[in-house]
């Protein structure tokens, strides 16, 4: 072997750009959440006020719209808006960051790749349930009947089950059924969160009824009758609410994330090719 011979240069690994990718995840999550939060807050308030008997759905929605138009600053800087915004930005960010960190750990060259499985489901469910229960506990006290009081543990359990179902049908089920639907993943993302409302809305109404009327003296049959009284219109309202939350909001979050991560990946590859030239 000649004295001046050197081993061939191996290609440099693609830079991970960890913080840039996390920044894109955060931007996509907060932008999607900011877009849908006003609508979500309006529907959530109307359901709580309607169930407690303080207002009808339409009257509550009308009052909220007038408030947004007349006092936008007070609306967007209010505690209820902050709770809704934190809930959805936190949920989207958890899903985004798990995908990104998993791709970095496995050195996946495709920046926008998404993961699935129990770890992501449990993590996103924990984030969503924790923030959602916090939001709903405040909303129930803000707009429920009587003076504010602690939320019973049974209400927390019902809210947690409701949120686990919502996450499963928003993040895990769509990729499974997408090949079976015209329009693929986007169609699945829009349909499945709405479909699960037939199961989750009764849980939501039962929790509100337990808080509003309380007491172990109320029979199960009476609870069921009260839930059935509000079920149809509340299910429709929650479908209308969930469509932007995990349908439109989910599509927007994914679109922003994939677009900017694709751009970052292309710039990174060009820099690497230039460095090797």
Curated annotation (Swiss-Prot):
Its main location: mitochondrion. Keywords: Membrane, Mitochondrion, Transmembrane, Transmembrane helix. It comes from the Eukaryota. It is a multi-pass membrane protein. The keyword Hydrolase does not apply. It is found in: Mitochondrion membrane. One of its GO terms (cellular component) is mitochondrial membrane. The keyword DNA repair does not apply. The chain crosses the membrane at residues 22-42, 73-93. This is Uncharacterized membrane protein C365.16. The lineage of its organism: Eukaryota, Fungi, Dikarya, Ascomycota, Taphrinomycotina.
């Amino acid at each position: 072997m000649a004295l001046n011979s050197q081993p061939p240069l191996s290609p440099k690994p693609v830079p991970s750009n960890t913080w840039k990718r996390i920044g894109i995840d955060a931007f996509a999550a907060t932008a999607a959440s900011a877009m849908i939060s006003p609508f979500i807050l309006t529907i959530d308030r109307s359901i709580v006020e309607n169930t407690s008997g303080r207002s009808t759905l339409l009257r509550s929605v009308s009052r909220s719209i007038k408030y947004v138009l007349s006092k936008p600053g007070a609306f967007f800087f209010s505690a209820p808006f902050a709770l809704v915004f934190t809930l959805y930005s936190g949920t989207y960010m958890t899903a985004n960051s798990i995908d990104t960190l998993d791709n970095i750990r496995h050195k996946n060259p495709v920046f926008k790749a998404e993961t699935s499985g129990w770890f992501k489901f449990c993590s996103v469910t924990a984030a969503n349930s924790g923030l959602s229960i916090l939001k709903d506990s405040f909303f129930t006290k803000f707009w429920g009947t009587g003076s504010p009081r602690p939320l019973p543990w049974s209400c927390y359990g019902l809210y947690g089950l409701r949120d686990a179902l919502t996450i499963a049908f928003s993040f895990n089920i769509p990729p499974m059924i997408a090949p079976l639907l015209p329009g693929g993943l986007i169609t699945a993302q829009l349909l499945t969160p709405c479909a699960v409302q037939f199961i989750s809305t009764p849980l939501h109404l039962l929790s509100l009824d337990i808080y509003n009327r309380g007491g172990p003296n109320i029979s199960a049959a009476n609870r069921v009758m009260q839930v059935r009284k509000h079920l149809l219109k509340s299910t429709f309202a929650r479908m209308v609410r969930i469509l932007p939350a995990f349908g439109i909001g989910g599509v927007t979050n994914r679109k922003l994330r994939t677009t900017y991560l694709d751009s970052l990946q292309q710039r990174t590859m060009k820099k690497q090719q230039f460095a090797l030239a």
